[in-house]
Every structure is written in C-alpha cells, then in structure tokens.
Amino acid sequence: MGVSTAAYDAGPDKEHATQLLNNELQDKGFLLTSTEDIINWARTGSLHWMTFGLACCAVEMMHTSMPRYDAERFGIAPRASPRQSDVMIVAGTLTNKMAPALRKVYDQMPEPRYVISMGSCANGGGYYHYSYSVVRGCDRVVPVDIYVPGCPPTAEALLYGLLQLQRKIRRTGTIVR
C-alpha cells in the first residue's frame, strides 16, 4: 500500500519525478498539484465582473447574462460594486470627462484585477475617434487584458473574450513570490 520511492530516485529532473509520483498516486485516488495551480483554478471558476457601460455596447453586454448565453455557467457572475469584482468590462465611448471616474473605479477593485475592452469605441475611440472629447482607447487610462472587437460586438464575442481571460489567468498565474 505504500508509495515507491522510484520517483525520488529519478535524478535531477524534478518534473519527471513529479510526473511519475503523480501517475502512481492517481491510481490510489490522490491528486498531486501545487497551491498556485489550485488558486488559479479557483480564480478562473469564480470571476466576478463589473459593468462600466458607457454606450450601445452595454446593451450587448446585458445579453451575456441572460438565459440564452448564461455566463454564470462558466463561473462568471455580475457584481455591482468594484470592491467585489475581479473583472471590469469597459463598453462604449470613453470621454475625457469620464476617464478619471474609470480610473477611480479601477483603483477600487481588489488585486488581481482584469479589464476587458469591449467594442470599437472602448478599443480605440471607434466612430468618434477624431472627436476632441474622446479618449482614443481605454488602454490609455487603465491596463487592458482582453480586447473584444466589433461595433457593437455580439454577446458571443464577449463570452469568447471572457473565456479567453479565464485561459489567460490559467496560463500566466498571478501569485507574487
């Protein structure tokens, strides 16, 4: 019933030794992983997004939460407060007057925080790009993790962007050492 130590005698290749030990323990009903992997797995399955809807893209954003697309089945739930959310979705035309409010809301979010820029206006100013009062992309105010193109992007495109964010979180890891 004991675990053999052959995995520990595999030499300097720790990854190979870990894989051997993991294969042996799986047959006995155990899982070998790291704390960082568990935290990232939990983080991707419980994203709480906050809307920062500024224009017509916000209507498409609402469709993502409705029964047809149901983002909650992927562990992505809406929240009203920035202090309870991990993800901010910026949708619509960001004006110079609204930019400080966007930054203030972003600063109120707990770490780690992510931003999705939704639509042509949020990505780069869109139709109003040459207007004197429009910020040419919300990435000039806050760091953006995922860009969702379109005018307005469909609910499927936003859902795909949210799933890509989950994939990015799993791939990169966010624990500071």
From Swiss-Prot:
It is a peripheral membrane protein. Its cofactor is [4Fe-4S] cluster. It catalyses: a quinone + NADH + 5 H(+)(in) = a quinol + NAD(+) + 4 H(+)(out). GO terms for cellular component: plasma membrane; respiratory chain complex I. Binds 1 [4Fe-4S] cluster. Transmembrane segments: none annotated. InterPro entries: NADH_UbQ_OxRdtase-like_20kDa (IPR006137), NADH_UQ_OxRdtase_20Kd_su (IPR006138). It comes from the Bacteria. It is found in: Cell inner membrane. Keywords: 4Fe-4S, Cell inner membrane, Cell membrane, Iron, Iron-sulfur, Membrane, Metal-binding, NAD, Quinone, Translocase, Transport, Ubiquinone. Signal peptide: none annotated. Belongs to the complex I 20 kDa subunit family. NDH-1 shuttles electrons from NADH, via FMN and iron-sulfur (Fe-S) centers, to quinones in the respiratory chain. Couples the redox reaction to proton translocation (for every two electrons transferred, four hydrogen ions are translocated across the cytoplasmic membrane), and thus conserves the redox energy in a proton gradient. This is NADH-quinone oxidoreductase subunit B. It comes from Dinoroseobacter shibae (strain DSM 16493 / NCIMB 14021 / DFL 12).
